[in-house]
């Protein structure tokens, strides 16, 4: 089941206090980036973030976004300030994005 644009809009409202949030649609779901780092996504109308020490300190419910994927944490918080703090705390634990080489 693909995620709805309405649910994505709701998640983006929650992320309004997070700088440089971008999305990328992929196979009916949405990947979420902040400052170029992939930190989570919207999968089957569920807002999930990567599991890091910082995110595990706030969230407890693990869910698998799709078959074969690593478990992620369900964001069941509706307070935009809490969500912004959560994302800000987990970003330093994520790797820097890999730079793509240009084709010649």
Summary of predicted features, one role per range:
Residues 1-104:
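Charge-dense, helix-prone N-terminal extensions
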């Amino acid at each position: 089941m693909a995620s709805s644009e309405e649910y994505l809009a709701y998640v983006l409202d929650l992320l309004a206090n997070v700088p440089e949030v971008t999305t990328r649609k992929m196979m009916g779901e949405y990947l979420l980036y902040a400052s170029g780092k992939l930190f989570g996504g919207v999968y089957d109308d569920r807002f999930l973030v990567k599991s890091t020490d910082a995110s595990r300190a706030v969230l407890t419910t693990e869910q698998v976004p799709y078959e074969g994927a690593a478990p992620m944490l369900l964001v069941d918080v509706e307070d935009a300030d809490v969500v912004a703090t959560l994302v800000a705390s987990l970003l330093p634990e994520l790797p820097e994005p890999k730079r793509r080489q240009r084709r010649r």
